[in-house]
Amino acid sequence: MISVTVEVDVDRPPPEVFNYLEDAENNPKWIPNMRSCRWTTPAPVTVGSRYEQTSEFFGRQIHTSFEVTEHHPGRLVTIESREGSSFPLKVTRIVDARADGGSHVTEEVEGDPSGFYAIATPLLRAMVVRNIRRDYKNLKRVLESAPQ
């Protein structure tokens, strides 16, 4: 089992940050190894909404189906991979307001790798931490450089 938590401060208002994060189709814009991401259910995002994504990790294409399993608009969204995905994964993204009007973002990732990935669990955890930190630096850069 892999469990990782990453936090970042973003100098943008929480509603803007949350709206960007909850729309999975934005993922390829700030996650470099994300190749594609599309909703398979209609808007708005709510518990039960689903999307498909393709990413690359360890040089392998990873196809994952996700479902929103918890949703508190403006603050928290949890997604979980569904059957047929490369490996079980649960991701929770939380956006909290800072006193200065900016946002504090927390991402909690839990995964249970199997097959090829299970063999490499210690290396996999280190790479996941590194990649998520890089991703959230990108998120900060993308959102803070966007016109207000």
What label would you give each PLM region?
Residues V6-V8, W39, T64-E70, L89-A97, ...:
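Hydrophobic/aromatic beta-strand elements that line small-molecule binding cavities or substrate pockets
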Residues S49-E56, V77-G84:
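Short beta-strand segments that buttress and anchor functional surface loops
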Residues E80-R134:
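Beta-strand/loop substructures that line and gate deep hydrophobic ligand-binding cavities in soluble
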Residues V128, I132-P147:
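Short amphipathic alpha-helical signal-transduction/dimerization elements
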Residues P14-P15, P42-V45, T69-G74, I94-H104, ...:
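A short, structured loop/turn motif at beta-sheet edges
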